[in-house]
């Protein structure tokens, strides 16, 4: 949990973008992306100024995961980018490298956010909590 929160802080240092991680045991939808979209709204991640929030969603017992990017960042990166990040995370999970897989994904998303939504200096504020959310 602490390593993941630290990765979020590091990833957000050079971007105005926001990253959150939500972990639960079971996904109550057939598709993990549907649950990620629901949680994105419930966590008010759609209320960032630049619509550049990203949610990593994991349902551990169901072995499902998804990444949901808000409109601003999704328009820049597209579905293929999110799929690539999920594939990379799954590769780490297949090696039982769960925390490293999540942290690497967070840092990669941070780089993409930095490219499209650079840090605004002192004007930039942390709009969303960096703590991992457990459902």
Model-derived features: where do they sit?
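Divalent-cation
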Residues: 1-14, 19-121, 125, 131-134
